[in-house]
């Protein structure tokens, strides 16, 4: 029996570190240009332990008015390294099926992941605001985050995989109290996107 191997988009670590040397980087246009020719699809089971590359993860922060969507990951979530932590983004790996001649592959992967994980009743806008290159945890050393801000006019949404995520809308003051329990990327986004905008 032939089983398919999941392949995910990854960036060469040396290129990423050169263009995005900081934990959070605002130079998204420069980074996109520099990454051309330095990304490839690799079997996920191989790249999970390959520290010469980082898997590209679209990470979408949802905002409605003065509140942000906060998601606690349950122990049923597949990534055990993030169990019970609070996240501020939804997203996931970019697969080769996301390739399209009409759309940037990272944007296409972001839209697919967003549609798979969460649906808002109205059309929402998403803007790329930065790139995370953090090595705080083991999981961070093999992933880089493309951070998008989603602006919604309503707090109403439909979240898939409800057994894996506990969502709630939080103000900045409420997020400040939760910061010690946040996953590392959520802390980066909290300081460099949410608090930086106030």
What annotation goes with each model-predicted range?
Residues 11-16, 63-66, 152:
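Short, flexible beta-strand-to-coil junctions
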